[in-house]
Amino acid sequence: TARPLVKGDGTRSNRPMSSNEQVGTGVLRSPGARVGGLRRPDGLLENVEACGLVDPQLGVVDRIIYTDERLYQQELRRIFARSWLFLAHEDQFRNPGDFFTTWMGEDPIIVTKDRKGRIRAYLNSCRHRGARVCRADSGRTKNFTCTYHGWAFDLDGELVSVPDRDNYPDHFDPRDWGLIEVPSVQSYKGLIFGNWDSEAESLVDNLGDMAWYLDAFLDRDPDG
């Protein structure tokens, strides 16, 4: 059953866990990003000036760029959260409900085919307490069910089942607590990519001249 939280005043709350409390998703790595009514303050994200760490004339690179945690987090925000990242291949999803789990940066991702045949990608994190809703590497399913408190999500990412529903606040609306979806998912020659940026340029435009090399390699086989 869903265990209520004990607040500082001794009262109990069964509120779902917010996106910010679960994981730093790619979309939330961007300064000022919002999910629902939440907004991560810009001040929490430290920017590092990296220009002085590289001397292009001498070809010298400060070794700190390989180990500094602040630079790594900045790369997650500025690069990985706004880039097209490879997720899977279309051949892995022949039937509705086929799924594959992978990563976008440090974010666990579920890639699946919905009942209309569309490839979708979701953050693999329950909106209640942040636990994984899919622990298998791949397979086929009708719903993704969190093993912590039993919340179940369908292939469209909608919250379709909540055990002990009467224990939740009256204002709790399951329609507001579906899985966080990767907003941009596109494919090229069977290769599926995702992007946390809903306004990102198209995958084809982003590939640019690299598409020629992909064509030369993938067109050798009619199946890609």
Describe the function of each predicted region.
Residues 3, 7-118, 152-224:
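Rieske [2Fe-2S] iron-sulfur-binding subdomain
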Residues 98-147:
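Glycine-rich active-site/cofactor-binding loop and its immediate structural neighborhood
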